[in-house]
């Protein structure tokens, strides 16, 4: 699994003009699933993201986690994270999991986050979505369960 993680002051996702998910301070996570991913990958990244110390303490140092701050997560599925651009001019998405496999792991990922006590908002899997966010910092990280 791959994630693009952004620390945000707010974020929302809209589908067909209607807000599907909206959060205040927390993390906006774009979530990609590949063929070899398992529930262990989802569990590893769920634990990592809620404990990742990317929020400022009273001294302005990144010492606090999402759990420490009571922040929220906006989780948006994005198969394009597995796009290959080495050859040609059009991305190749062969490394992205098939939709049925990706949906199961994406839903498991969100469930694991909720089990950790985090409020999770989502987009709509497979839909064309508009994502709005205010990146705080900016802080943006790429996480991969295989690396």
From Swiss-Prot:
SUPFAM superfamilies: DTD-like. Keywords: Cytoplasm, Hydrolase, RNA-binding, tRNA-binding. It catalyses: glycyl-tRNA(Ala) + H2O = tRNA(Ala) + glycine + H(+); a D-aminoacyl-tRNA + H2O = a tRNA + a D-alpha-amino acid + H(+). It comes from the Bacteria. A Gly-cisPro motif from one monomer fits into the active site of the other monomer to allow specific chiral rejection of L-amino acids. One of its GO terms (biological process) is D-amino acid catabolic process. Homodimer. InterPro entries: Daa-tRNA_deacyls_DTD, DTD-like_sf. A motif (Gly-cisPro motif, important for rejection of L-amino acids) lies at residues 137-138. It is found in: Cytoplasm. Belongs to the DTD family. Gene3D superfamilies: D-tyrosyl-tRNA(Tyr) deacylase. NCBIfam families: D-aminoacyl-tRNA deacylase. Confers the ability to grow in the presence of 20 mg/ml D-Tyr and 500 mg/ml D-Asp to B.subtilis, showing it can be used as a selective marker in bacteria that do not have a functional copy of this gene. Can also function in an E.coli MG1655 dtd deletion, although in this case it confers resistance to toxic amino acid D-Tyr but not D-Trp (D-Asp is not toxic in this experiment). This is D-aminoacyl-tRNA deacylase. GO terms for cellular component: cytoplasm.
């Amino acid at each position: 699994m791959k994630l693009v993680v952004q620390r945000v002051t707010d974020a929302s996702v809209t589908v067909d003009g209607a807000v599907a998910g909206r959060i205040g301070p927390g993390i906006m996570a774009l979530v990609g699933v590949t063929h070899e991913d398992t529930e262990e990958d989802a569990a590893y990244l769920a634990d990592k993201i809620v404990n990742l110390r990317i929020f400022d303490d009273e001294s302005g140092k990144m010492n606090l986690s999402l759990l420490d701050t009571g922040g929220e997560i906006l989780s948006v599925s994005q198969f394009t994270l597995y796009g290959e651009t080495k050859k040609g001019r059009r991305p190749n998405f062969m490394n992205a999991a098939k939709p049925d496999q990706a949906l199961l792991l994406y839903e498991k990922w969100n469930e694991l986050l909720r089990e950790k006590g985090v409020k999770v908002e989502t987009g709509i899997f497979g839909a064309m979505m508009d994502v709005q966010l205010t990146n705080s910092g900016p802080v943006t990280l790429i996480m991969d369960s295989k690396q």
